[in-house]
């Protein structure tokens, strides 16, 4: 577990206005005029000041009252680390850091804990430890439905603020949720393959073991199946559950590609979140099969560029994490309570020609 304090985190790279004034040889009065968009400052000076503010990471303190009264707003983030989706923690971390940079000077503090996706009891222990330290506002990304129910029951009894990040809990609809509509994302994947496979064919759907009972992944699969029913030309092979790692995914696909022609897949809808492994197998066997999956990470960028992966359905996890922090912070600091509980992130499609924008 680690503490991340906005005001501490940036000390090494931020400068005060007085320090910036000395550095660029422009008075603080002039810098204040630029900050407040006052007249009487030349365009050249305005540009010099703006460049310096950006270079030295200056952030205006928009809540001086909080600073003067030494007010702090602590939010606890307890999320998972996953081998099959190891980019998740990295992207969420980027969003948390962005929120600290924006709200740290206004008193925001984040307490961060990450647990192994296969050891969900660690999440319960982390939440309990944070509660003992007085944290009453939480952002939670979970792996075990059973464990998160225990956590939510306790936190709700204690009137804690809660945002569920990336995965919702139907039994507790009164909490905030920031993430995608999984069912709709599955429908979108089916629509993509319908367009990529105009002649029809069979679709292979691999699913890793850890997602076998994941309600969101099953909802995504359900959306895919329901949309596919509208296309008589496409047939989904029985989902291939039980894949526990890279080797199993690789072997399952290799075996399927060696089957008789009437059993080979003509398209792949990936639910292993290891598109890198699937793309490598297709390249090694020199097979061009329409391949659709979710999320963008560095290991698959090349396979999108060469069209081994035809399309990705992308969600901006970093922006979701930032949004979750902002919602809680604005409620704690300004009393801004949102009536809307479900905050769905947009789904974007990434293909070869627009990859450069992501």
Predicted segment positions?
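N-terminal helix-turn-helix DNA-binding module of bacterial transcription factors
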Residues: 1-71
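Short, solvent-exposed amphipathic alpha-helices that sit
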Residues: 87-104, 185-189, 215-235, 277-278, ...
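Short beta-strand elements in bilobed, periplasmic/extracellular small-molecule ligand-binding domains
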Residues: 100-119, 204, 225-247, 263-265
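Hydrophobic alpha-helical
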Residues: 130, 136-156, 224, 235-301
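Flexible loop/hinge segments that line or gate small-molecule binding clefts
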Residues: 144-184, 297-309
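Hydrophobic alpha-helical segments within soluble ligand-binding/sensing domains
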Residues: 177-204, 249-251, 300, 315-333
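Hinge/cleft segment of the Venus flytrap/periplasmic-binding protein
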Residues: 228, 316-358
């Amino acid at each position: 577990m680690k503490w991340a304090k906005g005001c501490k985190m940036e000390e090494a790279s931020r400068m005060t206005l007085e320090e910036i004034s000395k550095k660029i040889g422009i008075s603080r009065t002039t810098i204040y005029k630029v900050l407040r968009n006052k007249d009487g400052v030349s365009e050249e000076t305005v540009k010099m000041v703006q460049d310096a503010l950006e270079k030295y990471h200056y952030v205006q303190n928009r809540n001086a009252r909080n600073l003067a009264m030494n007010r702090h707003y602590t939010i606890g983030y307890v999320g998972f680390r996953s081998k099959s989706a190891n980019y998740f923690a990295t992207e969420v971390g980027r969003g948390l850091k962005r929120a600290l940079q924006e709200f740290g000077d206004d008193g925001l503090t984040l307490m961060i804990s990450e647990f192994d996706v296969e050891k969900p009891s660690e999440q319960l222990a982390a939440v309990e430890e944070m509660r003992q330290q007085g944290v009453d506002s939480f952002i939670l990304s979970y792996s075990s439905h059973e464990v998160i129910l225990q956590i939510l029951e306790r936190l709700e009894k204690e009137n804690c603020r809660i945002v569920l990040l990336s995965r919702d809990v139907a039994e507790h609809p009164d909490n905030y949720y920031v993430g995608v509509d999984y069912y709709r994302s599955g429908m979108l994947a089916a629509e993509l393959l319908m367009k990529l496979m105009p002649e029809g064919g069979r679709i292979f759907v691999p699913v890793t073991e850890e997602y076998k009972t994941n309600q969101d992944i099953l909802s995504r699969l359900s959306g895919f199946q329901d949309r596919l029913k509208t296309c008589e030309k496409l047939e989904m092979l029985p989902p291939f559950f039980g894949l526990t790692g890279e080797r199993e995914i690789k072997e399952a696909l290799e075996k399927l590609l060696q089957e008789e022609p009437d059993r080979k897949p003509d398209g792949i809808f990936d639910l292993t979140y290891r598109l890198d492994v699937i793309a490598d197998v297709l390249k090694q066997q020199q097979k061009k099969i329409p391949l659709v999956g979710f999320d963008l990470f560095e290991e698959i960028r090349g396979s999108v560029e060469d069209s081994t992966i035809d399309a990705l359905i992308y969600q901006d996890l970093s922006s979701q994490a930032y949004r979750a922090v902002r919602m809680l912070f604005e409620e704690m600091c300004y009393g801004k309570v949102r009536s809307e509980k479900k905050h769905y992130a947009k789904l974007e499609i990434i293909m070869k020609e627009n990859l450069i924008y992501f």
